[in-house]
Amino acid sequence: MTDRRSFLSAVAALTAVSAIDSDAWLGQLKGKHRQLFDVPEPDGGTVLRHVRSYLDIWREAYGVAERDISVIVVLYGRATPLGVQDEMWAKYKLGAAINLTDPATNAPLARNYFAHPQAGDPVGDGTPECSMETLQRRGVLFLLCNNALGRWSARLEKGGLGTAAEIHADLRGHALPGVVIVPAAIIAMTKAQERDFAYVRS
């Protein structure tokens, strides 16, 4: 019980310290057209295809430049692993945890193919243009829920992969470049909608 209390206290402290700084992302979003994608499930990277289509249609059908569009993708739940680096997928067996298989090896996925897919990976529409990295270059902002990281850490501890506190710190320290960790997905979505972001669950 003491260890669990210590872990929860550590998570609370991290959240408290980072809450103000983690809201800095709100000031980066200047586009007139604003869309938030709520993503609790990996679903083969369907959201990445939706985001790409969203940007493409604004440009091709309406002539709107990407600088005038702001897109947020909020990752939590089973989609939490999408926000961390390959090293974490291998170390904590994240592919096995969400039942994903590497098409190149037929073994549980040990890399984040949503971030940087290889040829043949079943992500989005199967092209690099649907990768997280490509969408980030187009201005898309990915948010990662700290609460979800905490729940994943507790789950991985039960699998004998370390203590929850150590795992939580490791996952936070290996978020994908450009991914912003927020205290809670639900609060981030509320803050975005208060700033006129349309909402869609994807």
What are these regions (language model features)?
Residues 157-202:
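Glycine-rich, aromatic-bearing surface loops/beta-hairpins
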Residues 27-42:
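Acidic/histidine-rich, surface-exposed loop or edge segments in extracytoplasmic proteins
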Residues 32, 67-71, 137-141, 195-198:
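Loop/turn elements at helix/coil->beta-strand transitions in domains of secreted/extracellular proteins
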Residues 46-64:
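Histidine-anchored nucleotide/phosphate-binding helix
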Residues 93-118:
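A glycine-rich helix N-cap at a beta->alpha junction
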Residues 42-44, 77-82, 142, 147-152, ...:
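Solvent-exposed loop/turn segments at secondary-structure junctions
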Residues 64-88:
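Acidic helix-start/capping segments at beta-turn-to-alpha-helix junctions
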Residues 1-15:
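N-terminal secretory signal peptides and thylakoid transit peptides that target proteins
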